[in-house]
């Protein structure tokens, strides 16, 4: 990627991305490198329940700050938000504060909720029974077999999300973010040129 001047982006939850920090910086100097990271839960204890076997949110925040200091742009995916679990103002504000401090370029969020396909739903409910006894019944009663499972607080949370991001210069329009990810204007031997990656 670096040798031929291509841009690079990856979605990760792992601090291991920092093993290649110098290479990522080199790619970003020649073309463009953007690291995307998923943040779901501000509270690390809850994160360990919802996202076992991956780095907790505070560790990912450290990665985002390291990338910031290295001059590498970042984008955060705010998903999934689970109704009755992490769909709180406190959780959202905590994640947004991390993003503000890390100076992320954009946050992708398609709403405060999640999607459940047939097959996934059964697995999800099984995990709910284990970690949050009794909550499965609330989901079944409220959402039935819906594919889109939105928080009852979606409107309020999305208003906070957009307001806080606007105040801090963080892009929230997915189309704008995806366009940013797929184009770069640093082409070896050319000035002020723009190349579409895809």
Set out the residue ranges of the language-model regions.
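Conserved AdoMet/S-adenosylmethionine-binding subsite of the radical SAM
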Residues: 1-142, 146
